[in-house]
Swiss-Prot record:
The keyword Kinase appears for this protein: no
Keyword tags: Lyase, Magnesium, Metal-binding
Binding site for substrate: R198, K251, R331, Y332
Cofactor: binding comment: Binds 3 Mg(2+) ions per subunit.
Entry binding sites for Mg(2+) 1: D100, E105
Domain of life: Eukaryota
The protein, known as: (+)-eremophilene synthase
Length: 357
């Protein structure tokens, strides 16, 4: 027996939802016509082959990585990058996803001591005169070092500084996540606590700085630190994690990952549909925050303002590219299910274990 609640959620006879209606994630600033980097196919083949060989992936893992298509993600985020910069972005996306998985569902997700050690060593890579990591013992750390070397060759000095600052924000957020997981003892986190943490762990802060590198943006440190610019960065990060937590909800439930906004709200008494609706409310708040930040942006003068505009474009293309990729990648849905979800805004939950309404 299947029943309909409020015209948008179906449940089975035992009271468990089999589908849920998601927010419209392609409205307002996310309705922009997408662009994809013309170097996508050329760079993808080389980058996929490299990472499979470098991380010694078996055939199954290599196929899984290829279907994830991190090159499409980079191509949508940095459509104007040349082939060299696009390749650096793809390598970075491979690095951050494999690095992040260790903190989400790997050996570091509940071990703050080991997590802090790994974060400390990773941050040390960015220091002047740092020792080169051992490629065989620490392949991800070594890969991060090669990415940093490539960024230093081309990025303006202030953008290099921003690269370091934003990576520290991300890594500090991961450590906070590990500590929260360890100390949670099954107790639900508040919405506010989760948002503060998730804004940093989604990876948007460093990714936006990498887009700035890829597009050869020369943003001054003064402009970077202005509250209006920082708010645009925060909005880009918030849109990305809200959309990611919606699209990845099924994957996270199946994997036992609790770092998901929908799951957090459900532990606080929300139904699945109510949690999705609340995510939509936060998304719409982001759109208002975006325009308020632009309205309060100072006028520095032609040369600085031009770079600020290009940087703000990166703050926008990050969540937009991530959203486009999320609906297509095999990591979450795959192109067929992603297309159907985009058209219907109905997420099928019938293949999940029973979830309390």
């Amino acid at each position: 027996m299947i029943a309909t609640i409020n015209g948008d959620t179906k449940i089975n006879g035992k009271g468990h939802p089999t589908e849920v209606r998601i927010p419209d994630m392609f409205g307002s600033i996310m309705s922009a016509t997408p662009m994809v980097n013309p170097h996508h196919f050329k760079v993808k083949a080389a980058a996929d082959a490299f990472i499979a060989d470098y991380l010694k992936m078996d055939k199954h893992e290599a196929t899984k990585n290829r279907k994830a298509d991190f090159c499409f993600c980079a191509s949508a985020m940095a459509p104007h990058a040349d082939a060299e910069a696009l390749r650096t972005m793809v390598d970075w996306l491979n690095w951050i996803f494999y690095f992040d998985d260790d903190f989400d569902e790997g050996q570091l997700d509940r071990d703050p001591v080991a997590a802090e050690k790994e974060i400390r060593h990773t941050l040390a890579v960015l220091e002047e005169g740092a020792e080169i990591p051992d490629r065989e013992l620490h392949p991800l750390r070594y890969l991060f070092r090669t990415i940093w070397d490539r960024v230093k060759e081309r990025a303006y000095p202030d953008v290099q500084t921003q690269f370091k600052i934003t990576h520290k924000r991300y890594l500090d957020g991961l450590l906070h996540q590990v500590e929260a997981t360890r100390d949670g003892n099954g107790q639900p986190r508040t919405e506010e606590d989760y948002i503060r943490m998730r804004r940093r762990t989604v990876g948007g802060y460093p990714c936006i700085s990498l887009i700035a590198y890829a597009h050869n943006v020369d943003l001054s440190q003064e402009a970077f630190e202005h509250p209006s610019v920082q708010e645009c960065i925060a909005v880009g990060c918030d849109l990305a994690w809200i959309h990611n937590d919606i699209v990845s909800y099924k994957k996270d439930v199946k994997s036992g990952i609790e770092h998901n906004f929908i799951t957090v709200l459900k532990k606080n008494g929300f139904t699945t549909q109510q949690a999705m609706d609340r995510a939509g409310e936060l998304q719409d708040e982001c759109y208002r925050r975006w325009y308020l930040a632009l309205a309060s942006m100072p006028i520095w003068g032609e040369s600085i303002d031009r770079e600020v505009l290009r940087y703000i474009e990166a703050c926008h293309s990050f969540p937009l590219g991530d959203l486009l990729w999320s609906f297509q990648t095999g990591r979450y849905l795959g192109a067929t299910e992603g297309y159907k979800l985009h058209e219907t805004r109905v997420l099928d939950l019938s293949d999940l274990e029973p979830i309390a309404v």
